[in-house]
């Protein structure tokens, strides 16, 4: 069983184009499920008015105690778990994927369970992969889009967490602010899965690791070179490198490096080789995987023209893949802007594994959901 560590991220501004995130230790786990069985007492206790403001801290602490006591977990950061647990989840993903691919539909561990999926940021892959996977394993998923729920605006996140916990067995959220996912996990009495924040994208990296195991035979000890913006995908690769040993290189323009504290955390773990490079051709030499993502993420589209200029020379094209060598695979978390960060030729090449990678979102997430629910 993995060791679970909680984190808090404080946001301050560094430069003009991205937040600087400082991780600090913070214990935030959760509260007991409420029994619906009738009380043995002959008369009900008198009702009292409870102040949400006054009770927020004790409630969060009791949520932590109960969630841990019930064997439930959150999936917020890759490095909340140890290497043994990460590999165990990936093994389970392969096992359940094989079962589903065989056409067997008798494995239904989520029968009678519901999941709320909060989407502050829309996503085809995240919605369909979670909803389909949960359904195939017997559960029912509920989509909550920006018009259904506005955490921190129409309703406080701590209230959303408590309400949804009383309706559901699990909550998945894809949000902008990393603090939103931390608050959901803090106040929810059911497991919370991070479907993406501006800081990290742990479910994607689990799918990536699964894809590498299938195509390379392993991901431990490989060389992964990410070419592009030092964004949430990079942060998740760095957090994985703090748990599992491999060689990770982020090749990005100056001024677009990943969060310095996260880089330092990965280096301090002392198990992986971590490099930040500004020379993509040199960086990709000997790579097992060349990885790319959009240059302007959701919420940065007004910077698209500026970023295209800044990222000249960082497009993944055939010349760059040739520099990587014949064993290199190409990966992309999608959606891709073909002709911008990657050429159409590379996406469609035999060494491109972007579509198996996309499929593995569902299989990796199925295993994550099984793990957090103690199945």
UniProtKB/Swiss-Prot annotation:
* A Pfam entry, by short name: OTCace
Is Repeat set as a keyword in this record? no
Family annotation (InterPro entries): Asp/Orn_carbamoyltranf_P-bd, Asp/Orn_carbamoylTrfase, Asp/Orn_carbamoylTrfase_sf, Asp_carbamoyltransf_Asp/Orn-bd, Orn/put_carbamltrans, OTCase_ArgI
Question: Which residues fall in a coiled-coil region?
Answer: none
- Keyword Cell cycle: yes or no? no
Q: Which family does it belong to?
A: Belongs to the aspartate/ornithine carbamoyltransferase superfamily. OTCase family.
This chain belongs to the protein called: Ornithine carbamoyltransferase, chloroplastic
> Lineage of this protein's species?
Eukaryota, Viridiplantae, Streptophyta, Embryophyta, Tracheophyta
